[in-house]
């Protein structure tokens, strides 16, 4: 998940001047990274993230925008927890923060998706919503056949809100339920690059695009190599089949075969892997490849006509599956 860390590190250092966008990012990050809890009758806002820089950014924005202090607890890696986690908690002013960020509605009920002011906000707010969601629970895989940018969502309503925000940014995203968990996925390479830029991870996008291009170049080279191999195999089989038919033609015609056709046929039999152009150079006197092809074609046609009249196997009978398999 190296690319994921690179994106989150860059986004956590991004300077955003728009107050509206900063509010949208805080709201989205809180919605996707944690939730609301009732502790001793009070609403507590929590968010769990995987980088200290994200926790510090969120704590600073909450204080700058809303004036509330947050406490960050560090959960060290141990047991089933593979990596260090950071839990930000606003306890004393949790309900006030939840109402101001739109996590609670006017009646004090939790908002299941994203608040209306974020969903219906500006393009900058839509970018900030994606930035907050990615900082909370996003991942970016290495470029390849199964490359994807994903965000794990707290519920289907939040997933649909994120899909809508992506649509406003001109990015195609899909909401999916995987093993009981809601996710929003972007798979198209161009769309992933565009979304990284929209969120503010331009430097990481350049790295990701470079790796993507290198992989595509390697894939193209492999396809061309496979194509060349297939062409060589087809050419080899065609040459073996042609030589077998010519041998049968010479058997059918015997002494009745014209000398100029016989010489072209013998060249084909003696040099089975040679191209028509090479056979032309080997002829005495030399011929063009079209002249060689024409003589071999007439030789086969003459032999097939005689075989039909006499009721014997024609030149095609010499081309057996075993013969082609060995080619």
Curated annotation (Swiss-Prot):
Check the record and name the Gene3D superfamilies matching this protein.
Answer: Homing endonucleases
Entry's InterPro entries?
Homing_endonucl, Sporu_reg_WhiA_N_dom, Sporulation_regulator_WhiA, Sporulation_regulator_WhiA_C, WhiA_LAGLIDADG_dom
Among Pfam families, the record links this protein to: HTH_WhiA, LAGLIDADG_WhiA, WhiA_N
Highest taxon of the source? Bacteria
Q: Which GO terms describe its molecular function?
A: DNA binding
Q: From the UniProt record, give one GO term of the biological process aspect.
A: cell division
Residue ranges the UniProt entry marks as DNA-binding = 275-308
**Xref: HAMAP family:** HTH_type_WhiA
Provide the function of this protein: Involved in cell division and chromosome segregation.
Q: Which family does it belong to?
A: Belongs to the WhiA family.
Per its record, how is this protein called by name? Answer: Probable cell division protein WhiA
Which species?
Mycobacterium marinum (strain ATCC BAA-535 / M)
Origin organism lineage: Bacteria, Bacillati, Actinomycetota, Actinomycetes, Mycobacteriales
């Amino acid at each position: 998940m190296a690319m994921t860390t690179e994106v989150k590190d860059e986004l956590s250092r991004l300077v955003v001047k728009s107050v509206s966008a900063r509010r949208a990012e805080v709201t989205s990050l809180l919605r996707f990274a944690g939730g609301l809890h009732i502790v001793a009758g009070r609403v507590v806002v929590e968010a769990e993230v995987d980088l200290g820089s994200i926790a510090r950014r969120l704590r600073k924005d909450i204080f700058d925008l809303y004036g509330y202090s947050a406490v960050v607890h560090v959960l060290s890696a141990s047991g089933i927890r593979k990596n260090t986690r950071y839990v930000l908690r606003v306890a004393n002013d949790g309900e006030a923060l939840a109402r101001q960020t739109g996590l609670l509605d006017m009646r004090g009920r939790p908002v299941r998706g994203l608040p209306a002011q974020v969903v219906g906000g500006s393009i900058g707010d839509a970018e900030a919503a994606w930035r907050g969601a990615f900082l909370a629970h996003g991942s970016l895989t290495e470029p390849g056949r199964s490359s994807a940018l994903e965000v794990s969502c707290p519920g289907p309503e939040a997933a649909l809100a994120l899909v809508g925000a992506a649509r406003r940014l001109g990015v195609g995203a899909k909401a999916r339920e995987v093993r009981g968990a809601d996710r929003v996925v972007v798979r198209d390479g161009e769309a992933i690059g565009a979304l990284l830029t929209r969120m503010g991870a331009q430097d990481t996008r350049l790295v990701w695009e470079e790796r993507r291009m290198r992989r595509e170049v390697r894939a193209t080279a492999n396809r061309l190599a496979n194509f060349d191999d297939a062409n060589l195999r087809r050419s080899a089989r065609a040459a073996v089949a042609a030589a077998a038919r010519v041998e049968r033609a010479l058997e059918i015609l015997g002494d009745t075969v014209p000398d100029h056709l016989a010489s072209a046929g013998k060249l084909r039999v003696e040099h089975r892997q040679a191209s028509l152009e090479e056979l032309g150079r080997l002829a005495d006197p030399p011929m063009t490849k079209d002249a060689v092809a024409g003589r071999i074609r007439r030789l086969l046609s003459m032999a097939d006509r005689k075989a039909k009249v006499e009721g014997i196997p024609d030149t095609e009978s010499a081309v057996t599956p075993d013969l082609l398999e060995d080619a």
